Amino acid sequence: MFKKTFLALLLSIGFGSNNFKYSYTVITTNEEINIDGNLDELVWKTGTPISNFSQKDPQPGEPARQKTEVRVAIDNEYIYVGAYLFDNSPDSIAKQILRKDGWGYSDWFAIGLDSYYDKRTCFGFHVSPSGSMRDMLHYNDTDTDDSWDAIWESKSVINNDGWSTEMKIPLSQLRYNPSEEEQRWGLNFYRRTARYGEESFWAPIFMESKGFVSQFGILKGIILPKQNRRIEVLPYISSTD
């Protein structure tokens, strides 16, 4: 009985500790980033990338089968994401071309941003190897609104050892509290490898926990004195090289 109680206590502590253990400091940049999926800008060689994803399915808690490296940068108008999704069998990458907000049989990479840092609300941005895009709003920690649409850019490239992607997300598409002082946002990354039926996250999502956004890690180093409300109008184009 004591053993079971002690184990339950350890697990409950673990479920609430992601936002302390998993943290990343955003890269502040003035570099012009060309969204072509190639990760050849200097910013994508800065600092240590996020890695070490853990499976949610099919083997919860086990390391993801394929390596992922991610960096996040920011300027006065945009959040940028550069990710390399290694794959030792690139010919097996699932890359079905889909309409915007489609799902289908495809590999995926996503970022989740809790820009209010309320541990209940998250803006999600997904991209596939074919360049297909999805966006959604998570609210009440676990609920999802797939009808939410943002204006943002991405491009993916399939290489001989995996695929890479770049995202450019206008700050005007997010909701946050402007401040002259450094603020923190909730952060997580997701990868789906379709042929394995595998879903993995940077900050682990424990099935035993009732929450989703509340299990995110932390994005640090953000200073945004004012909220950008510039209107963005961009066409949706699904493409890959």
Residue positions per predicted region:
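Sec-dependent N-terminal signal peptides
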Residues: 4-13
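Structural preference for beta-rich elements and adjacent junctions enriched in aromatics
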Residues: 16-241
